[in-house]
Amino acid sequence: MSMIGTKSFFISSSPKVPVGISWGPSSYRTNSSLSVRSPTLTCSISTISQPTRKEPATTKPEIMEELHEGTRKELLTSSSPIATMKLIDSIQRLGVGYYFEEEINTLLDRFLDLETTEDLLATALRFRLLRDNCFPAHSDVFGKFMNKDGKFKESLRKDVWGLLSLYEASYLGTKDEVELVEAMEFTKTCLEEQSIPLMAHKLSRHVSQALDLPRHLRMPRLEARNYIHEYSLESNNSPPLLELAKLEFNAVQSLHQKELIEIVRWWKQLGLVDKLGFARDRPLECYLWTVGIFPEPYNSTCRIELTKTIAILLVIDDIFDTYGSLPDLILFTEAVRRWDLNAMESLPEYMKICYMALYNTTNDIGFMILKRHGLSIVPHLKRTWIDMFEAFLTEAKWFNSGYVPTLEEYLDNGVTTGGTYMALVHSFFLMGQGVNKETVTMMEPYPDLFSLSGRILRLWDDLGTAREEQERGDVACSIECLMREKRISCDDEGRKQVRQLIRSLWTELNGELIAPSAMPLSIINASLNLARTAQVVYQHGDDKKGSSVDNQVQALIYIPISFPKRRDLKLL
């Protein structure tokens, strides 16, 4: 079961039933599963088949430069360390941090030697900013707020803003940082006990949002969209920063639309869905994963090329999951191991077109990287696909034999079938930062960073889709494996423990964030963003709240941010 791109972002009351093709039905799955597959997104895609807006006049380079300079000046002349930290936090949450990377790094470097204060909000904010940007930050700075028993002082309960700041910081803790483990439990309890309706509106809004989803776990592009509105309500916001964020969001959204049009054109020309009536037609959903992983404008090629690979992955997943017989799946896997066009001749007709699409798309990416960096990377890309096929085949054999794996067996295999290794290895080469002969060797074996992110993705997918898959008679998922191992009979308890496992995996992932490594920061962030996107996509799947994801998709791809006609700004 591939997870990247598998969940429908749109809910429909009349799902479209794919039409079967003439080749024989699968002995691996029953064709009845096809009838519950989500509808294609042709209607949604058609809404952006033409440009949706004219570029506003305020996107002229001189206006953007004026806004950049105004924000930069304000950042460098801020009145106090806490004001500077708050401004950095806002810049990054608004999605324009890449414009001020040098200035932010210089300022954060100064904060390393900043004397800590008795202000809980400032201490927690400093810790979070440093750690989130891969600067050294030690959790013992919170010791001054704890009593001799290692518990946070009861007097802190009155400082709700400080509690909120500490709560957000605690989500960047590692598994060995007892102060942050205690901080999460203490602040969560305190914030939940507060009477939110009695709080000031601004504070209650922030508390509710944090308890629903802490900042560290949010998808950056979606956070930028939501925070632009929040920031506009702040009485002390920075006018040039706010306008810059709005204009930048709309400009990047327009770029995303153009990329999606290019992807849809490629997908139609490829013709896999026309030839394979059982295959999913979801280029939009595949693209949304890449927006979650790397939304920045300079990663345009990465999004386009990775979307292509994910779209092909979904078709391969459908062959393994719903259509191919076990003997044919063995042939398919062997052909991919050989990786040559002659191997294709032994395949059934419906597999040949998919094999050719995979072969050509992968080699095209390899050629692109060869021209850019002088490195031959096809063997590395090919390896991710071979591993994927072998993991799919393992899952097919489990299903045919009725074998229920242990949770560890399931997760080890599920990270691969979920597409994490394929997606992140491709991303590493496509982003290009730090790609050289030395760093290429870090892709073999797969980094722990990738494995942890992939496990989080796998578990969130199961929480979001397990009930539907159980109805189809799919392979046992992590919830079932865990319940079987621990002899749990209550489904809700099984789900609770899976969520606890996800939280534990995040502490390990945070450990990778601060561990000394030659891994480029771009791929570290991509790994974190993959896990974040999984939570956004799947966290409400078991609660039947898919419409909330639908709204998020509309906000990210289709609906620009509107604002009053621009007036001259007083730039500080």
UniProtKB/Swiss-Prot annotation:
Gene3D superfamilies: Farnesyl Diphosphate Synthase, Terpene synthase, N-terminal domain. InterPro entries: Isoprenoid_synthase_dom_sf, Terpene_cyclase-like_1_C, Terpene_cyclase_plant_C1, Terpene_synth_N, Terpene_synth_N_sf, Terpene_synthase-like, Terpene_synthase_metal-bd, Terpenoid_cyclase/PrenylTrfase. Its EC number is 4.2.3.-. A motif (DDXXD motif) lies at residues 317-321. Belongs to the terpene synthase family. Binds 3 Mg(2+) ions per subunit. Mg(2+) 3 binds at residue 469. Does not produce any detectable product when tested in vitro. The keyword Metal-binding applies. Mg(2+) 2 binds at residues 317, 321. Keywords: Lyase, Magnesium, Metal-binding. Mg(2+) 1 binds at residues 317, 321. Its cofactor is Mg(2+). The Asp-Asp-Xaa-Xaa-Asp/Glu (DDXXD/E) motif is important for the catalytic activity, presumably through binding to Mg(2+). One of its GO terms (biological process) is diterpenoid biosynthetic process. Probable sesquiterpene synthase. It comes from the Eukaryota. The keyword Magnesium applies. It is an enzyme of class 4 (lyase). This is Probable terpene synthase 11. GO terms for molecular function: magnesium ion binding; terpene synthase activity.
